[in-house]
Amino acid sequence: FIKIVELINKLTIIIITTIALVFNFDVYGLIFAYIAAGTLVIVLKFIYILKNKLFEFKFVRVSRKMYKSIIIFSGWNMVALLTQRLTYNIVPSLLGFFSGTAEIALFTIALSIEGYIWTFSNALNGLFLPKITKLNIDGKTEEINQTMVAVGRFQLFFMGLIILGFYLLGPEFVNLWVGEDLEPAALVGFFLVVTGLFTYTYGIAYTYLLVVKKVKYYALSLIISLVITLTSAVFLIPHYGALGASIAIFGGNLIGQVIIMNIFYHKIIGFNMIDFYKKVHLRSVIPMAVTLVFGIYIKQLIEEYSIKNLIIKIMLVSIVYVALSFIFVLTK
């Protein structure tokens, strides 16, 4: 129920933003709508928790070993969470030092888009924790792998549509949203999210890391990603501004969160990542490639920027992508 409420909240935010774009609401009305939606979600969660008695406090003696285990796990988890978002807080400062306010504005718009997409990608996180925990206790490793493939396909289907759609129609969306001058923010945003075609499909693998208390490997990969990002950003930002910053983040994410995490998953955790990519990503190549070509054709066919034309393009691209995905991915 809580995950469903969170997903509804995220959808509501997107709908509110779209309505604001169409009817030209002022910023105060938009902020009030966001606050109202967030408050409603908090109230619904609180009522659900009280009604179902999800928490019960018992004061019992806890062993030192358990304390140590909790502290270590919580520590690595905190490092992972902080490092994950630290990049996006440091990079604007580098942009201000090496480039200027114009590039910060571009990056801020791109970061807003990345935030929305990241929020959607995490809608299912934690939902399978009870199931994966039980399968691990029962020693059913093969079923965990099967669940990872099934959830990975769904995540790639859903997030693939969003990321591919943003690549095709992002410039038009940004143009209509914030104006022609900030349209380059679309390409900046694309580099921030494109590695999500891989990382967003690792939800079950990350959940398994939590279950077996090996989240430190995820934290280490994020630290490596952060170091690579900041090092390369210092060299790229003076020449390419916000685009250079996004390319630096792309490189850090690709090496740290994709390549290195795949090594951890395959060698240390024991997941067959090659088989995973064959069953998830390889099957999605045809739907994505055909949709990409079709989307480019539609953009050339309907060149004028308008809310109406953007909605038409989104619908056409979505129909083609969903139809092909059902044929080649979801029904197999």
Q: Over which residues does each language-model region extend?
A:
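Interhelical loop/hinge segments that connect adjacent transmembrane helices in multipass membrane
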Residues: 27, 45-88, 127, 131, ...
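Hydrophobic/aromatic end-of-helix segments at the C-terminal termini of transmembrane alpha-helices
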Residues: 87-95, 99, 128-129, 169-174
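Short runs within selected transmembrane alpha-helices of multi-pass transporters and secretion channels
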Residues: 1, 5-17, 30-47, 80, ...
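Helix-loop interface residues and adjacent transmembrane-helix termini in multi-pass membrane transporters
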Residues: 24, 98-101, 211-212, 239
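Membrane-proximal transmembrane or re-entrant/amphipathic helices at the cytosolic face
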Residues: 271-273, 295-332
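Hydrophobic alpha-helical transmembrane segments in multi-pass integral membrane proteins
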Residues: 80-84, 164, 230-234, 287-303
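Specific pore-lining/lateral-gate transmembrane helices of multi-pass inner-membrane transport
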Residues: 106-223
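Interfacial/gating helices of multi-pass transporter permease domains
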Residues: 27-28, 65-77, 93-115, 143, ...
